[in-house]
């Protein structure tokens, strides 16, 4: 996918680099696969109106596309009708048309194109875009959209350019290596999609100006040292050095403190990403 650099016709255009994909559909999304929910309009507030997630607010209105993460339509092949941009995620999406007339969106894998046939099931061929239980996928294969519980739908490796490698099998479990370096066990009957997620060049784009980030619903991040003592533990003082270990606005250590609290699933992690 070519990356173009914009001409410096203004300070906001000087450093902009964009991805150009001529295969993406230019029209409206498939209407029956749109949710009534308008995404990212909470402003980071909960039902009491209090901020629970900082740095969220504004941005362009966007409709949520209903993505098929379960890939449970077995025995019926589908053809890729078009590839589309999805404002809710970094990956592109593909519109599938099944032989029985049903349409579904999936994450667009790398190296698939319009007109390709895709299927799911226990005995489908090993090729990018096909979904099947991991017990039927060869060791060493690259996969994405991996389930953590059978039938729940893919939860791992869903962003642009991400993938997971199957490294071994241990009885009822498959041993997977994640991009973070973590190695974990997941049950063999969990489904995964062959190949890696497309649009890996997404990370090479440059927005070029702060306003482009605001279009996406991201608000500014203010340094703690620039605040007053009432607002942040790093605030106040005459100089820039705050003279203590860095902490969050609520006094929790930010450098190296473990935050994982789900001890119930620790037994499935064979090697943590930090080791």
Curated annotation (Swiss-Prot):
Q: Which GO terms describe its biological process?
A: cytoplasmic translation
Q: Which InterPro entries match?
A: NA-bd_OB-fold, Rib_uL2_dom2, Ribosomal_uL2, Ribosomal_uL2_bac/org-type, Ribosomal_uL2_C, Ribosomal_uL2_CS, Ribosomal_uL2_dom3, Ribosomal_uL2_RNA-bd_dom
Q: Which GO terms describe its molecular function?
A: rRNA binding; structural constituent of ribosome; transferase activity
Tell me where on the tree of life, at the top rank, the source sits: Bacteria
Return the annotated region ranges for Disordered: 214-275
Its cellular-component GO annotations read: cytosol; large ribosomal subunit
Residue ranges annotated as compositionally biased, kind Basic residues, are: 255-275
Gene3D superfamilies from the xrefs? Answer: 2.30.30.30, Nucleic acid-binding proteins, Ribosomal protein L2, domain 3
What NCBIfam families does the record point to? Answer: rplB_bact
Q: Report the sequence similarity comment from the record.
A: Belongs to the universal ribosomal protein uL2 family.
Q: What does this protein do?
A: One of the primary rRNA binding proteins. Required for association of the 30S and 50S subunits to form the 70S ribosome, for tRNA binding and peptide bond formation. It has been suggested to have peptidyltransferase activity; this is somewhat controversial. Makes several contacts with the 16S rRNA in the 70S ribosome.
Q: What is this protein called?
A: Large ribosomal subunit protein uL2
